[in-house]
Amino acid sequence: MVRCSFDKLSSGHTALVRDLLETSEDALAVVEQTDAEGRTPLQWAASSDAKLDIVEALSSAGSIDVNARDHSGWTSLMIASSAGASSIVRWLLQHGADVHASNTKRITALHYASSKNHVDIVRELLEAGADVNALDGANQRPMYVIKSGHPCSLLRPAFSRTHLVY
């Protein structure tokens, strides 16, 4: 059943996911299942704004852990922030996602959004209270992981209202 649910989830078809949840004897168990890397269906859905309907369908199954971590410590918020899935980031923040969570490399969602130059997501995370001075495993702050070759000026205004330590 685990493989079936992940196959339906990764297909991107909301109707398939809803059907799985409606026909399952225990929909919450389907939502809480993990794959070999420890990722939940919510974490797989968090990778694309196109899957917002799937995220909402999964949450309708019952109490869903928006802060669940895979074996590397990644949360759904980190995945969505890295992927540029701004509507998923917004949904996760509205449903209690921890903006301060870091993975096994001490990388936060803000680090990921900054490194990919996802300006709107950086703003969302900062407004939600993300720590601009959080150090990752390489002692880098989010502002300093901005992808080289991209104009830093896009992100500087988002960071300017914060208490960034230089």
Regions found by a protein language model. Name each.
Residues 12, 49-50, 84, 117, ...:
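Ankyrin-repeat intra-repeat helix-capping/turn positions
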Residues 4, 128, 147-166:
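Ankyrin-repeat-protein effector appendages
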Residues 21-29, 56-64, 90-97, 123-130, ...:
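Ankyrin repeat domain, specifically the short helix-to-loop turn at the C-terminus of the second helix
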Residues 34-35, 70, 103, 136:
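Ankyrin repeat boundary/linker residues
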Residues 1-24, 32-47, 56, 164-165:
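Intrinsically disordered, low-complexity regulatory segments in ankyrin-centric signaling systems
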